[in-house]
Amino acid sequence: MAGGLVYTVALTSCGRHDLLRRTLRSLVATLDLPPREIVVFEDGGDPGARAAAEGLDAPIRVILAEGRLGQMRAIDRLYAEIGTPWAFHCEDDWEFTRTGYVAESHALLAARPDVSTVSLRPIGELNPLIRDTPETVAGGVRCHLLDPARHPEYFSYTFNPGLRRLSDLHALGPLAAIGGEADVSLAFKRRGFRYAVLAEPAVRHVGWERHVDDPAGLSRPRTPWARWARSARKRFRRLRRRFSDDA
């Protein structure tokens, strides 16, 4: 493949087919290195995902789930379909704004084996704890290398759009057995990883008001009580981990 990179675009979708079409159109228009294929996994099995992928100038394969699996099980199922050493992970609610980001991400990851993935989002949209991360250069690419020590779980992995090594994911085993995104990030943190953010953003989130609930119970809380309960659960888990690590 061009640039020495053999990769697959792995994209999860769940019923938001107008956003999926928008994501795919911008992605196909901006990919600077061609993937082996784009694999879309439609959680819930809605055939509208196939219509959203029609007519685009790219090798796109759509897989329809049998029922709802939830985010992490859907990701596990999707990645079981991928036979390339690299994957560009994506979801169905992003719009890509420039080209060049695949080659930049590959160069950065080749230079920094401690980086798990490369985010394309503006750093000003990310967690306030890391917005002041200084800009540096890795692999000839301007970027921000996040400090995992700034949070007990975050900043070592993200499922935001970005390139990643399949070997790092396979080393963890099934992600659904680990938990949610924060738990996966913690697993990467314990292996010495961080993630990086390109200094020049290449994507924007277009699904802010279109959140999809997760049947596995990992959905974002929407009421003050639900947010308080989630915060309490997180604090309890952190205390349990701390005592377990000290034992």
Feature locations, PLM:
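Short beta-strand-to-loop acidic/aromatic patch adjacent to the donor-nucleotide binding site
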Residues: 85-95
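Cell-envelope/extracellular polymer assembly enzymes that use nucleotide-activated donors
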Residues: 6-8, 37
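Conserved donor-nucleotide/metal-binding helix-loop-beta segment in metal-dependent transferases, i.e.
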Residues: 99-117
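C-terminal catalytic/acceptor-binding lobe
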Residues: 22, 154-157, 161-167, 171-247
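Short, well-formed alpha-helical segments that are part of the catalytic scaffolds
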Residues: 16-31
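Short beta-strand-to-loop element that shapes/binds the nucleotide-sugar donor at the catalytic cleft/hinge
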Residues: 118-132
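Glycine-rich, basic loop-to-helix element that forms the pyrophosphate-binding segment
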Residues: 66-82
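A conserved acidic beta->alpha catalytic loop
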Residues: 42-50
